[in-house]
């Protein structure tokens, strides 16, 4: 049996999970080949969940990070199909937990995409980067949000709070004062998560300033806040207690709202200050140890402002109305899009101008040709006119051209009257009388 056949049989045995057949084929020298998609035996064993087969192949030295033609590793296969035991086996054998395929998606992305909660927990346990972004600028949190998977959302949110952001360039730090609660109605408690970006707030004494890191990496944070605010039950005004780590801002009765705009790195952070309601009687809503969850505050104009207690890790985000959707585009892409649009318009104008010039040149060329043809016709007409005039001048000379032509046609002998008389005299003088020749036609021409 050839090596090619041995390699094909090894792929099929790995797909079916036939451990003994895999051992026999490798003992007979079967190469670690791949199919036309670049799928290795370990890929197939991981995809179909054959733990023992994968273990045999790893012990035999198969590459644990082998890549298909779309750069998928066996860990991608196992995570996408929900084989947690295979995932753990691969990670314990040194597989790259943050390997990215052609779409720049990690195993955590694929596990979240297919709702495999146990695989997500396992990957996070072994250090998967929850801040990794795919080719479509989406993190695992964004995918879980699109799939409406609340359990995975909670897991990822906790992991993001505990894990240092691996993409610090996506966060623009903004220095603000100690967090406040801005309210003009009811305070809604968020039961779990807020955003996919890792943010930190630090506080010392009550009057010290805190630093809040904002991130524009997640485009669906606003939708998360709105959905969670609707899902959470509003707290009654009678269930309020004093929040020692928060400061309440009460707006002036005359100036009901003040808007402060803080810009940093091209971003805009809007703080809305409205008529405040002191939180003096909250008893059951806030735990004795302090506020354990973030708060979202709804103001009258439909905006929502998230605020957190001092020392808690969360993100402060302003949700504006749908008119601000245009600002969701990455700020670095807007000038590029405008430049591309301008260049396209300029190229269109240049093309149209060149086309018009070509048409004008073609019209001029045809007009020149028509002008030459007209001049030539005029010259020919002039020549015909001159010929006719010459012929008309030759007619009055007294020469009968038609008669001459007729004489030429019958081959007649043309003699004058004088010649006839002389001829008759000669004949009569010699013979006396003579008859004219009968075979010759004679014509008298008088001048």
Swiss-Prot record:
| Record Pfam families | Ank_2 (PF12796)
Q: Does the keyword Transcription regulation apply?
A: yes
Name which cysteines form disulfide bonds: none
Which one GO biological process term can you cite for this protein?
Answer: positive regulation of transcription by RNA polymerase II
Major localization class: nucleus
Q: Does the keyword Acyltransferase apply?
A: no
Q: Which PROSITE patterns match?
A: ANK_REP_REGION, ANK_REPEAT
Q: Where is this region: Disordered?
A: 418-447
Localization terms from the record: Nucleus
PTM Phosphoserine: at which residues? Answer: 253
Question: Where do the ANK repeats start and stop?
Answer: 5-34, 37-66, 70-99, 103-132, 136-166
Q: Which SUPFAM superfamilies match?
A: Ankyrin repeat (SSF48403)
GO (cellular component) term, any one: nucleus
By its UniProt entry, which InterPro entries does this protein fall under? Answer: Ankyrin-SOCS_Box, Ankyrin_rpt, Ankyrin_rpt-contain_sf
Q: Which UniProt keywords apply?
A: ANK repeat, Coiled coil, Nucleus, Phosphoprotein, Repeat, Transcription, Transcription regulation
Which GO terms label this protein's molecular function in UniProt?
A: identical protein binding; transcription cis-regulatory region binding
Q: Which residues form a coiled coil?
A: 345-395
Known role: May function as transcription factor capable of interacting with purine rich repeats (GA repeats).
| PANTHER family documented for this protein | ANKYRIN REPEAT PROTEIN, GA-BINDING PROTEIN SUBUNIT BETA-2
Relate the assembly described in the record: Heterotetramer of two alpha and two beta subunits. The C-terminal is necessary for the formation of a heterotetrameric GABP-alpha-2/beta-2 complex, and also facilitates homotypic dimerization. Interacts with ADGRB2.
The protein's name in its UniProt record: GA-binding protein subunit beta-2
Q: Which source organism does the UniProt entry give? A: Bos taurus (Bovine)
